[in-house]
């Protein structure tokens, strides 16, 4: 704790992280503002289905194409989590992008190496379960509150502690926390990336890291901070 405070005060750690990490992530995310729910549903999901069908006919594809598809699919997943991190309006879009990121990673890996169905199922089972729970929690919260944005801290844990708890579990689930099979599935994913495939490993690892940050950000914006309603006493920010 002493070293952390020293780093903040004397070495300007917070400003350094803001310069080299948070600002670049936000800048990249702003370049992806064209990504909305409609484009995800009408373009990228059909593109994923097309990629899955291409895998079924993998033997008929040129080897040059097969060799670059893993990096392409993993990059699409990385783009999704960048957009999720910078999203300031719809928590539904941010959540869906994190979930779909894992499906793009799975598609990249099946093109990259021979992977058993059980390994992919083990990896995606936790994502599907946690993603479903989180999406249902968002739907229920929207029914109650009508308007939920992630442009500010809403503090809904004050009125909805149960939603906050289940959404936190779902967030930990889709970010690979060791409460679902995805935690082990991520290790299985990396076992199918060669030691010479630096770009693919970078895309996948970066996706896991940024998706974790983006997921916790959604939870924090919806449930933490001062309560957006002012019918009760609120502490000053300085306190």
Regions found by a protein language model. Give the residues of each.
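Hydrophobic alpha-helical transmembrane segments of multi-pass membrane proteins
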Residues: 72, 76-79, 121-128, 202-210
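Interfacial and helix-entry/exit segments of alpha-helical transmembrane bundles
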Residues: 131-203, 208, 215, 232-239
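Divalent metal-coordination and catalytic microenvironments
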Residues: 21, 95, 153, 182, ...
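Helix-coil boundary and interhelical linker segments in multi-pass alpha-helical membrane proteins
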Residues: 55-64, 107-121, 192-200
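Central hydrophobic cores of alpha-helical transmembrane segments in multi-pass inner-membrane proteins
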Residues: 26, 74-83, 130-139
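Alpha-helical multi-pass transmembrane bundles of energy-transducing inner-membrane proteins
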Residues: 89-151
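Membrane-water interface at transmembrane helix exits
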Residues: 22, 83, 109, 138-142, ...
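Membrane-interface and transmembrane segments of multi-pass membrane proteins
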Residues: 1-55, 59-68, 74-75, 213-218, ...
């Amino acid at each position: 704790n002493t070293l952390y405070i020293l780093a903040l005060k004397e070495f300007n750690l917070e400003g350094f992280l803001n310069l080299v990490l948070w600002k670049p992530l936000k800048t990249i995310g702003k370049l992806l503002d064209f990504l909305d729910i409609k484009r995800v549903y009408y373009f990228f999901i059909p593109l994923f289905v097309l990629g899955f069908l291409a895998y079924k006919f993998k033997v008929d594809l040129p080897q040059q194409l097969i060799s670059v598809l893993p990096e392409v699919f993993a990059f699409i997943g990385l783009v999704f989590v960048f957009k999720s991190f910078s999203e300031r309006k719809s928590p539904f879009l941010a959540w869906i992008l994190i979930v779909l990121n894992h499906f793009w990673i799975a598609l990249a890996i099946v093109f990259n190496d021979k992977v058993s169905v059980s390994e992919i199922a083990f990896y995606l089972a936790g994502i599907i379960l946690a993603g479903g729970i989180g999406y249902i929690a968002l739907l229920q919260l929207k029914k109650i509150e009508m308007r939920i944005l992630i442009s500010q801290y809403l503090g809904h844990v004050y009125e909805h502690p149960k939603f906050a708890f289940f959404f936190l579990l779902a967030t930990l689930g889709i970010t690979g926390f060791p409460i679902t099979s995805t935690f082990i599935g991520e290790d299985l994913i990396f076992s199918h990336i060669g030691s010479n495939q630096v770009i693919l490993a970078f895309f996948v690892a970066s996706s896991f890291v940024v998706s974790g940050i983006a997921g916790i950000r959604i939870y924090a914006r919806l449930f933490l901070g001062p309560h957006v309603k002012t019918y009760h006493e609120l502490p000053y920010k300085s306190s």
